[in-house]
From Swiss-Prot:
It comes from Sulfurovum sp. (strain NBC37-1). GO terms for molecular function: small ribosomal subunit rRNA binding; structural constituent of ribosome. It comes from the Bacteria. One of its GO terms (biological process) is translation. It holds the Pfam family Ribosomal_S6. Belongs to the bacterial ribosomal protein bS6 family. One of its GO terms (cellular component) is ribonucleoprotein complex. Binds together with bS18 to 16S ribosomal RNA. The keyword Ribosomal protein applies. Transmembrane segments: none annotated. Keywords: Ribonucleoprotein, Ribosomal protein, RNA-binding, rRNA-binding. The gene is rpsF. This is Small ribosomal subunit protein bS6. Signal peptide: none annotated.
């Protein structure tokens, strides 16, 4: 089994419950293809670098998992047909250095999940 990271962006028009349901759907696909989900990093609502499907913002989520090559095709097929997902990217970690970095990312994602959420900081604006 190889190490993979999939980042996907969900439409910003969804409610929190709908967004959580879409993320759960993708996690269910991982379970169906016998992928081992190691960590999830919910990055939250962010501004996109450029408009995608007339959206300037999106809800980012990163999944770290181990799976075989055939599973990736099914995961990406489900991401393509999901109308709520506006963009996605899957990265395969192959070399030892890449796998070491993958392990660090998984540890950081699990650590941030265990830590209590910090209060959002107020944005500063210059006059």
């Amino acid at each position: 089994m190889n190490c993979y990271e999939t980042l996907f962006v969900v439409k910003p028009t969804l409610t929190e419950e709908e967004t959580a349901a879409e993320i759960a759907k993708i996690k269910d696909v991982l379970a169906k293809v016998d992928a081992e989900l190691l960590a999830t990093d919910d990055m939250g609502m962010r501004k996109l670098a450029y408009p995608v499907q007339k959206n300037d913002r999106g809800y980012y989520t990163v999944l770290f998992y181990k799976a075989n090559g055939e599973a990736i095709a099914e995961i990406e097929r489900n991401l393509k047909i999901n109308e709520e997902v506006i963009k996605f990217l899957t990265v395969k970690y192959v070399k030892n250095k890449e796998i070491a970095q993958f392990d660090k990312l998984v540890a950081a994602a699990n650590k941030s999940k265990d830590a209590e959420p910090a209060e959002p900081k107020a944005e500063t604006t210059e006059a």
